[in-house]
Design a protein with these regions (language model features):
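Conserved RNA-binding domains used in RNP assembly and mRNA/RNA metabolism
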Residues: 3-63
């Protein structure tokens, strides 16, 4: 997922499926506050549970 795609979900409650560092998939319902870019790490979603790296997001849908 790219930053412009992720910005469509700002301020919304979403269901986000992402992989962890071990490759396991997790699905969480989150509220997305911001999309940021961190040098050397890449883009991430700032959500109410934690930051989620965009390169690990496999699917996202608004609730």
């Amino acid at each position: 997922m790219l930053i412009p795609e992720a910005k469509n979900y700002l301020g919304k409650d979403c269901s986000v499926t992402f992989s962890d560092r071990h490759g396991s998939l997790h699905t969480h319902n989150v509220h997305i506050y911001d999309v940021t870019f961190t040098p050397m790490y890449g883009a991430c979603l700032v959500a109410d549970i934690d930051d989620i790296w965009l390169e690990r997001v496999t699917s996202i849908s608004a609730l």
